[in-house]
């Protein structure tokens, strides 16, 4: 048995998911959807750097779904709920399950209650499962923390830090992080909403709070530019000394006046250029205290690609509804033929 997978969006992450899916014994990549005229109509296998497969890159998702008959569509196009809601409904009308790496979809119930109700209704109307996931939100600063609290008798508060490298990501992430801007442009971008830093603090904090039964009634965020002292260059970004290399973003979740969850997430391209070591650090204060250090960081690009691939069977095998990671079977790497979870 092989699940049929259609990928919508062939940016850095979407292409990675498509390539990974094509290498899995229990998954079959049946096509992709793109808006870039230079990609449309090309052979998908050849575009991904392999041999011709006869599977094409479509411009029209309706035609793609009708012709390829996927079990699931992986949407890798946008970060925000409002941007993917219509796309999700378009796929759902074909009674096809959906997995998206849109960060706000990891746990939209707190930040977008009205849209979440709409999505829940769509899921039940068409009998489909909908899940948002990725490395973060979706794993490091939420699901992994939730799993670790399972070894605690009680939990008083949580602190976690993810110090990571943005280099593997594409232009959309660079833009939302302010990479390549001047300090003045960064400040203006924060004010206009063009620069948002990390997308997902509200989702991660709300997911943790929901899992632990904490009534998180307020989430506060702060953002500061990371000014580069060195020249840095990736395939999609070029930063000179004095320009912004990333964003130091902090999210805090409160129950009343009590700080329960603090997540710290400085993200920048090529942090090693200035001697910064990446890593993931989780501190759970309770009984007992638990402290986890992962060095270097779990790579953001590979981690997102892996989770978007590895969660496919769980989404297909789940019942209808708008799902979130903590209510599904724990992620595991797909190595061989898929067995029912």
Regions picked out by a protein language model, each given a short descriptive name:
Residues 11-13, 80-81, 105-109, 135-141:
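Gly/Ser/Thr-rich loops at beta-strand to alpha-helix junctions
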Residues 1-94:
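N-terminal glycine-/serine-/threonine-rich beta1-alpha1-beta2 phosphate-ribose binding loop
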Residues 8, 12, 16, 68, ...:
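Conserved active-site and cofactor/substrate-binding residues in soluble primary-metabolism enzymes
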Residues 103-128:
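Rossmann-fold NAD(P)-binding glycine/threonine-rich loop
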Residues 97-99:
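A short hydrophobic/small-residue beta-strand
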Residues 139-150:
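Alpha-helical support elements that line or immediately flank enzyme active sites
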Residues 8, 149-280, 298, 305, ...:
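Active-site-lining helix/loop region of Rossmann-like oxidoreductase modules
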Residues 269-341:
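C-terminal helical cap and adjacent loop that interface with cofactors, partners, or active-site loops
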């Amino acid at each position: 048995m092989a699940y049929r997978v259609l990928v919508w969006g062939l940016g850095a992450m979407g292409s990675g998911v498509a390539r990974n899916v094509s290498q899995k014994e229990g998954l079959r990549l049946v096509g992709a959807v793109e808006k870039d005229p230079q990609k449309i109509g090309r052979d998908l296998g050849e575009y991904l750097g392999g041999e011709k497969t006869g599977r094409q890159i479509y411009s029209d998702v309706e035609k793609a779904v009708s012709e390829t008959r996927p079990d699931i569509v992986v949407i890798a196009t946008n970060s925000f709920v409002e941007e993917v809601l219509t796309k999700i409904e378009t796929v759902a009308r074909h009674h096809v399950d959906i997995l998206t790496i849109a960060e706000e979809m990891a746990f939209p119930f707190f930040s977008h209650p009205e849209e979440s109700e709409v999505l829940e209704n769509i899921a039940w109307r068409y009998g489909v499962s909908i899940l948002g996931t990725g490395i973060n939100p979706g794993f490091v600063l939420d699901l992994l923390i939730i799993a670790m609290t399972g070894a605690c008798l009680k939990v008083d508060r949580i602190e976690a830090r993810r110090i990571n490298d943005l280099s593997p990501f594409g232009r959309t992430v660079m833009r939302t992080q302010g990479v390549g801007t001047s300090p003045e442009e960064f400040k203006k971008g924060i004010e206009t909403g063009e620069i948002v830093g990390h997308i997902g603090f509200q989702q991660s904090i709300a997911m943790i709070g929901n899992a632990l039964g904490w009534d998180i009634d307020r989430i506060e965020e702060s953002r500061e530019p990371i000014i580069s002292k060195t020249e840095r260059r990736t395939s999609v970004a070029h930063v000179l000394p004095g320009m912004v290399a990333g964003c130091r973003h902090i999210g805090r979740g409160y129950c009343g006046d009590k700080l329960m969850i603090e997540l710290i997430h400085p993200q920048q391209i090529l942090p090693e250029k200035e001697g910064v070591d990446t890593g993931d650090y989780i501190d759970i204060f309770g009984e007992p205290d638990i402290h986890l250090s992962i060095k270097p960081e779990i790579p953001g690009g590979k981690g997102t690609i892996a989770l978007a691939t590895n969660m496919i069977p769980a989404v297909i095998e789940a019942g209808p509804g708008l799902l979130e990671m903590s209510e599904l079977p724990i992620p595991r790497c797909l190595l061989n033929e898929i067995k029912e979870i």
